[in-house]
Amino acid sequence: MSNQSLTPPFGPQDVEVLERETPFQGFFRVDTLTLRHKHYNGGWGEPVRRELFVRPPAAAVLPYDPVRGEILLVEQFRVGALEWRDTPWCLELIAGIADKDGESAADLIRREAVEEAGLTLGTMEPIAAYMPSPGGTNERLQVFVGHADLAGAGGIFGCPDEALIACCRFRRNLPW
């Protein structure tokens, strides 16, 4: 690999939004954009239409008990997995979307940990911030590892029968 910068050469000024419509507004929103953008040869491309699934920022946490050497995952039904997996119940990190103005990602995750798993998180460390699928959504996701006492973890939390807690033990401690 060459010694090139990983910073893209283009920015927002290199995109021209010609039209933006909102054909769907529900719990989430879908926008249809007609836009054009610069090409690597320096010229502007022809207008294209793109659908954008508009989502608030999201955050997730991997609860980790360094004393017990365990992590916690939440099992929940997910409609998005209905057609792509053997089962639409997924083992996941505790996660949520920002639904309160001004709530930080860390505060969001502390709230979700209580709501989804009855957990109080201690020290939290950020481990990633990324856009999971920027070709079709503007969602931004921040991921943390959070120390927690998982000794009494387990059961069903959140809405009735919404989340089942699963703890997994490791043979050695993780670096967090």
Model-flagged regions — what are they?
Residues P23-R68, L82:
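Acidic, metal-coordinating catalytic segment for phosphate/diphosphate chemistry
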Residues V30-T32, L73, V143-V145:
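Conserved hydrophobic/aromatic beta-strand scaffold that supports enzyme active sites
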Residues L35-Y40, S133-G154:
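Active-site-adjacent beta-strand/loop module that shapes the phosphate/pyrophosphate-binding cleft
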Residues F157-W176:
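NUDIX/MutT-family hydrolases
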